[in-house]
Amino acid sequence: MTVFYFIRHGKTEWNKASRYQGAHGDSPLLPESYQEIKLLAKHLAAIKFVHAYASPLPRALTTARTLISELPSNIPLTVDSRLREFNLGKMEGRRFDEVKARWPQVVDSFHFHADKFDNRLIDSESFSAVIDRFRAAIEEYAAAYPGSQNVLVVSHGAALNAGINGLLNVPLARLKDRGGLSNTSTTILQTADGKNFQLKKWNETDYLHKTTVDPTDTI
């Protein structure tokens, strides 16, 4: 089995401000995010990773590099644009409440009814486009590392949610059934053939030892 550990990047200033970042927006990690990445590294310390892959967007790449620096072994890192965040078009850079007021149906479908999402209304990517590029990347990694090997993938909330559910062949109408993915969370999939994937863990965050749930942590 090739086992994939999917990590969502650490929380950023725009995450905290409830502002969409997407594929073109970005903001620095919060100071506390670096401590959370250290907790993640401690959680993963016993696992031997053969390779790490990361989105080129600074918030994800910084998370990946910080995480690797905290792990006991030297893990090679490859930057792959196929792991970038969902291109959200006109939503990018805007606050959640502003976007909801301007495009209520778009926001509802994006968060809850992916099968009804019309990307043309905001000049964004479609769910199918994100799923296709994500699948192509992960299948390539699985082919490169068959057998009992562990692969680390650092990406973004919306892209990971769509891409992972795509790997699990979840229909668009059910894409949001498991809920969102939190900052610095771990989701684990395994595959024996590089084509069919099984879910082992979804949105694991216990190692962060959070006592309260901040709604801006999860998308």
Model-predicted segments: where are they?
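Short, conserved phosphate/pyrophosphate- and ester-handling motifs at nucleotide-, phospho-/glycolipid
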Residues: H9, H156
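Extreme N-terminal starter segment of soluble prokaryotic enzymes
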Residues: M1-Y5
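Acidic, low-complexity terminal tails and accessory targeting/binding regions
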Residues: S73, L88-E98, A143-Q149, N165-I219
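GST superfamily/GST-like fold recognition
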Residues: G157-N161, Q198
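Phosphate-coordination/substrate-recognition cap region in phosphate-metabolizing enzymes
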Residues: L39-D108
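Loop-to-helix element that buttresses phosphate recognition and phosphoryl-transfer chemistry
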Residues: K11-L67, I122-R135
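Short glycine/proline- and acidic residue-enriched helix-loop micro-motifs
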Residues: D108-A129
